[in-house]
Each structure stands twice: as structure tokens, then as C-alpha cells.
């Protein structure tokens, strides 16, 4: 029996990144031998065991052969005669096909070290094409390591295109697509994930609502980048700088979906694109089974981001109604989330990356004023039932009006 550290732990250590999880491969052993040594078996489809002390995963060396369509139909073979090189060959990228023995020596049969040094994401073998999930994984790795200068090897991108055009991605379940997307949204450059999907044709298959935005023009006066698809990726990049929250980043990604519905004869203007985009947000989220909380914020951002841009023009009643519409009284975090997504929208434009966004400050200030109106005082004044809400709203509007006159007067 020989044990090797494999995969991501070696890759990240060589890149100087924190190592979160360590995975091990066991060569020349059997399930019974692992159980006799005190390991606990956890894998159903192939032999994976937990170490009795560290609880890290130890997998018997195995090979995989595609036996059907999609990414789940694989026949696994795990036996003592499977070599380390055999096991590493089934992995997706060369930088993940590295192993390290107990002396610290790195085994690199597929030039993963060279690709790591050259910042290349390259597939190990043609077997890459048997698993459509790998298209998403490579896009996610591209986003994760973009800040280090990584790019996808030409031959790998070509293979990803071939897989997409062959219809392989249609076998992916919504849950897996969302899981990879959610992981990509946590990276430093989530926009790279969607750009890679577009480069290989997968965006049109998995995110047609986003793909439809490319080639749709917006007024050059407000959008020097012109193309709404490019603007969408720029806003996502900006959102990633402003917030680590997946729901903020996803909502920003979806904020302009309604522009994809504008008839070409009305271009480059997109009146009413916000409310129009709400149905597309719901459609996308239902298809990918996006969690409700993330979906709900995306709907609100699509509907109200343009309203927040015009904040100085809003009367106090409209401002308080906005807080009602986003359910801010029960979910106050939505005010901050709307401020951040709207700021990302404004700064996600060519030449506006460092722009100030006072509307965000005014939104936050107006919220502090509105929520500081005490409910207790209304009740103590003798109001009852529905009168309480009506009087509370009236007082909130009055408080916001007083604040607005001093801090955010309506332009002449």
C-alpha cells in the first residue's frame, strides 16, 4: 500500500494559496485492507474512506469509463493493479493531476508543474470530453485564478466548444449548474466564469437570458461600453469589489435582463426594462432552482435599480413606499444590498469605475430616518388596528421629507 497527497492541496500550496482540504489516493490496497486499518468507508459508487484520526478523505486509486450520457454514467474500476498514473489521468486539469509522496517528492506525469508555471488550464486527456460538468469547472477555475494570470489552453477551450455544440451540457442537472455558479460567484473575478461560458457557447445553453444581452446597445451617453452584455459583466466585476455576498453579486448579474426583451427598433433606449426583467429573473431562477432568498433580491434589484438612480427626484412618499416594496421593515439588509447593486450598476461602465454614487448614501440615510420613527409612540397616541400602520406611514413620510429638504433637495 502506498499513499499520496493529490490534487488541489498541492496546486494551491505551490501557488502560495491557503490549503483548505487535503485529499489522498491509496495505491495497491483493497476496501477490506482499509477497513482493517480502521478507516471508515463513505463512498457508495467508488471506495472512499475517512481517516480514523484526521477524517480526511482517502480514495483507492481508480479508473473511470463513460457508460452513458451526462456526467453521472461512469463505470469505476478500483483495484490494487490501478497505478497512480492511471488515477491521475482521469482528472480534469493537469494542474490538478499532481501527487506528492511521503518524502515530499512531487509526481507529475502530465506536466502539471509546467502548466502551473505558465498559468495554463489544460485538460489531462481526451476523457475530459466525457464529463460536461468539467466545462463549468474549468470556467470556475478560470474565475478563481484570474488574478494570478491563468488562462485556458486553446486546445481545452476548443474541446469545451465541441462538448457544448454536441449537446453534452443539456445532461447537466439544474442543481449542479447552480452549485458551480454559486461557487464561481464567490471568486474574486466572477465575471470571468460567464465570459468563459460565452467563449465556448455554453452561456447560450445555460444562461440564455444573459447571453441575449450581448449585442444589445445602450445609449453611448450613459454607457460608453455600448454593449449591454459587456456592461453586465462589468457590473458583476464591480459588485465583487463592493461585496462578498453571493446574493448581491447574482442580483447585479440579473439587473438588466429586461433589456434583452427590447425590440431592436426601439434600441438603444430601454424604457421599462426593470419591471420587464422581473419575469426573466423568475424564469432563470426557477430553471436553475436558485434559492428563494437569492431570487427575491434579484427580482427587487431588477425592478428598482433605476428608481434608486433617480433618488433626488423621488418624493418622500415614494421613498417610504420603496421601503415597503422591498420589505425593508422585516429585512433591513435589503437596503444595503440595493445600495450596493445600484452602485455597481453605475460604476460598471467604461470611464465610471471610480465614480461617486451619492444615491447610495442618500438611500441609507433615508432608511435610517424612516426606521427611527418609533412605533410605540403611535400606539401610545391611541391609534388602533389599521390606523397604526397608516399613522406610522404618515410619520415616516414626514420624517423623510424633513431629512430630504436638508440633505437631498430635489433638483430644480
From Swiss-Prot:
Cofactor note: Magnesium is required for nucleotidyltransferase activity. Nickel for phosphatase activity.
InterPro entries: CCA_bact, HD/PDEase_dom, HD_domain, NT_sf, PolA_pol_head_dom, PolyA_RNA-bd, tRNA_CCA-adding_enzyme
GO molecular function: ATP binding; CCA tRNA nucleotidyltransferase activity; cyclic-nucleotide phosphodiesterase activity; magnesium ion binding; phosphatase activity; tRNA binding
Catalytic activity: a tRNA precursor + 2 CTP + ATP = a tRNA with a 3' CCA end + 3 diphosphate; a tRNA with a 3' CCA end + 2 CTP + ATP = a tRNA with a 3' CCACCA end + 3 diphosphate
GO biological processes: RNA repair; tRNA 3'-terminal CCA addition
Chain positions recorded as ATP binding sites: 8, 11, 91, 137, 140
Cofactor: Mg(2+); Ni(2+)
Keywords: ATP-binding, Hydrolase, Magnesium, Metal-binding, Multifunctional enzyme, Nickel, Nucleotide-binding, Nucleotidyltransferase, RNA repair, RNA-binding, Transferase, tRNA processing
Chain's role: Catalyzes the addition and repair of the essential 3'-terminal CCA sequence in tRNAs without using a nucleic acid template. Adds these three nucleotides in the order of C, C, and A to the tRNA nucleotide-73, using CTP and ATP as substrates and producing inorganic pyrophosphate. tRNA 3'-terminal CCA addition is required both for tRNA processing and repair. Also involved in tRNA surveillance by mediating tandem CCA addition to generate a CCACCA at the 3' terminus of unstable tRNAs. While stable tRNAs receive only 3'-terminal CCA, unstable tRNAs are marked with CCACCA and rapidly degraded.
Domain notes: Comprises two domains: an N-terminal domain containing the nucleotidyltransferase activity and a C-terminal HD domain associated with both phosphodiesterase and phosphatase activities.
Protein name (Swiss-Prot/TrEMBL): Multifunctional CCA protein
Source organism (scientific name): Shigella sonnei (strain Ss046)
Record gene name: cca
Amino acid at each position: 500500500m502506498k499513499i499520496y497527497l493529490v490534487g488541489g492541496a498541492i496546486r494551491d500550496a505551490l501557488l502560495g494559496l491557503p490549503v483548505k482540504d487535503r485529499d489522498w489516493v491509496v495505491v495497491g490496497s483493497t476496501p477490506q485492507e482499509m477497513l482493517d486499518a480502521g478507516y471508515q468507508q463513505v463512498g457508495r459508487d467508488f471506495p472512499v474512506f475517512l481517516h480514523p484520526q484526521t477524517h480526511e478523505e482517502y480514495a483507492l486509486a481508480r479508473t473511470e469509463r463513460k457508460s452513458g450520457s451526462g456526467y453521472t454514467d461512469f463505470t469505476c474500476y478500483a483495484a490494487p493493479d490501478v497505478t497512480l498514473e492511471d488515477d491521475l489521468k482521469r482528472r480534469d486539469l493537469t494542474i490538478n493531476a499532481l501527487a506528492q509522496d511521503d518524502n515530499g517528492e512531487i509526481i507529475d506525469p502530465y506536466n502539471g508543474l509546467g502548466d502551473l508555471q505558465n498559468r495554463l488550464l489544460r485538460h489531462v486527456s481526451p476523457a475530459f470530453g466525457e464529463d460536461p460538468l468539467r466545462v463549468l469547472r474549468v470556467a470556475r477555475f478560470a474565475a478563481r485564478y484570474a488574478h494570478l494570470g491563468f488562462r485556458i489552453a486553446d486546445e481545452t477551450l476548443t474541446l469545451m466548444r465541441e462538448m457544448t455544440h454536441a449537446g453534452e451540457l443539456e445532461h447537466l442537472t439544474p442543481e449542479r449548474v447552480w452549485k458551480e455558479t454559486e461557487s464561481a460567484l464567490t471568486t474574486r473575478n466572477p465575471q470571468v466564469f460567464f465570459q468563459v461560458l460565452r467563449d465556448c457557447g455554453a452561456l447560450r445553453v445555460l444562461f440564455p437570458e444573459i447571453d441575449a444581452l450581448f449585442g444589445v446597445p445602450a445609449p453611448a451617453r450613459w454607457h460608453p461600453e455600448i454593449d449591454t452584455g459587456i456592461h453586465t459583466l462589468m457590473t458583476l466585476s464591480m459588485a465583487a469589489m463592493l461585496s462578498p455576498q453571493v446574493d448581491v453579486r447574482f442580483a447585479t448579474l440579473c439587473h438588466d435582463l429586461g433589456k434583452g426583451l427590447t425590440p431592436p427598433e426601439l434600441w438603444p433606449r430601454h424604457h421599462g426594462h426593470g419591471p420587464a426583467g422581473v419575469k426573466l429573473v423568475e424564469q432563470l431562477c426557477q430553471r436553475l432552482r436558485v434559492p428563494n432568498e437569492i431570487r427575491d433580491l434579484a427580482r427587487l434589484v431588477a425592478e428598482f435599480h433605476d428608481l434608486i438612480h433617480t433618488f433626488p427626484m423621488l418624493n418622500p412618499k415614494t421613498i417610504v413606499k420603496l421601503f415597503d416594496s422591498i420589505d425593508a421593515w422585516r429585512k433591513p439588509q435589503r437596503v444595503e444590498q440595493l445600495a450596493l447593486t445600484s452602485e455597481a450598476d453605475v460604476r460598471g461602465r467604461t470611464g465610471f469605475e471610480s465614480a461617486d454614487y451619492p444615491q447610495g448614501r442618500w438611500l441609507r440615510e433615508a432608511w435610517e430616518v424612516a426606521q427611527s420613527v418609533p412605533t410605540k409612540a403611535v400606539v401610545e397616541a391611541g391609534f388602533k388596528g389599521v390606523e397604526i400602520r397608516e399613522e406610522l406611514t404618515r410619520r415616516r413620510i414626514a420624517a423623510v421629507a424633513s431629512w430630504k429638504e436638508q440633505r437631498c433637495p430635489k433638483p430644480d
